[in-house]
Amino acid sequence: MPKRRDILAIVLIVLPWTLLVTVWHQSTIAPLLTTHKDDGRDPRREAAPGADPREYCMSDRDIVEVVRTEYVYTRPPPWSDTLPTIHVVTPTYSRPVQKAELTRMANTLLHVPNLHWLVVEDAPRRTPLTARLLRDTGLNYTHLHVETPRNYKLRGDARDPRIPRGTMQRNLALRWLRETFPRNSSQPGVVYFADDDNTYSLELFEEMRSTRRVSVWPVAFVGGLRYEAPRVNGAGKVVGWKTVFDPHRPFAIDMAGFAVNLRLILQRSQAYFKLRGVKGGYQESSLLRELVTLNDLEPKAANCTKILVWHTRTEKPVLVNEGKKGFTDPTVEI
């Protein structure tokens, strides 16, 4: 058995050599490890020695901002010289969900070829929010504005039922079309009044594109029903209306349920939505009776048996905590 003195001598001899080998190993391997880590190209690794760590955060933030500013919407399909243009007329007004509604609608319209979006704001001037959104979409658009006079609105939360929201804005769009295209224009096109809170199937736009005079189809979630629809006979002609609310209206149809040939709009220059003396639910009739008769209507969507548009409504956000304790920045655009 080795003596204690011999064990101590062995330890004193081996320990220095162990330390030397360890130091040598570290000095050889460390540069290799550093090289592998730098391959990740972390900007923090590339910073100069002694630099302020906050500068790394600022650098990262700048990179993120560049990515954001370079983002663009998917561009619409290439323009075709053979397809009729669909002129989509959308009245809009300032409210918390306006940008969300217009963004959702833009994402639908971006898939439709040969589309011109006529957005008309109920405002004394065009707002920066809507202008930026339209510019960023890449859609072919026209941005108009006209403010509904106060005497056309009731004081308080309710509005005069004789002056439905969007009437003056739709009329301005009709005037713009007549001032832009000559009365005898050969430009093929279709005009569709599409509110910004509805939901639209892409199939709907292809259905309406072949409109000769006025085409019609069902609309879901209107009149207290799952859907309202034109009544079509076996010969494919519209003979009435499947609706509960005042079915004897000349055209008992929702604003989202019809499209008009552009040439008809140009030729019938007297046709507008009436501002006064029109009962609730008769706004559509006030325009259509100046354009066609019941016999002229063209049923679409499989003889008005398919639902391709839904009168959805976005729930009004409850912002009861807004402005409390500085949680949100009022300058942030929503």
Label every model-predicted segment.
Residues M1-P53, V64-E70, P247, M255-I334:
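C-terminal catalytic/acceptor-binding lobe
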Residues V14-L15, D62, H87, A100-R104, ...:
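Acidic, Ser/Thr-rich intrinsically disordered and amphipathic helical segments
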Residues D81, H87-R95, V120-D122:
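A conserved hydrophobic helix/loop-capping motif in glycosyltransferases and polysaccharide synthases
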Residues P84-I86, L109-L118, L139-T142:
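Short loop->beta transition adjacent to catalytic acidic/histidine clusters or analogous donor-positioning motifs
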Residues Y93-V97, P124-R125, D197-Y200, Y272:
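Short acidic, S/G/P-rich loop/turn micro-motifs used as interaction or catalytic elements
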Residues R95-P113, R125-L133:
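Short, well-formed alpha-helical segments that are part of the catalytic scaffolds
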Residues D122-G189:
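Active-site-proximal specificity loops/subdomain of glycosyltransferases
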Residues P161, E179-N184, Y192-A194, N198-Y282, ...:
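Conserved catalytic core of nucleotide-sugar-dependent glycosyltransferases
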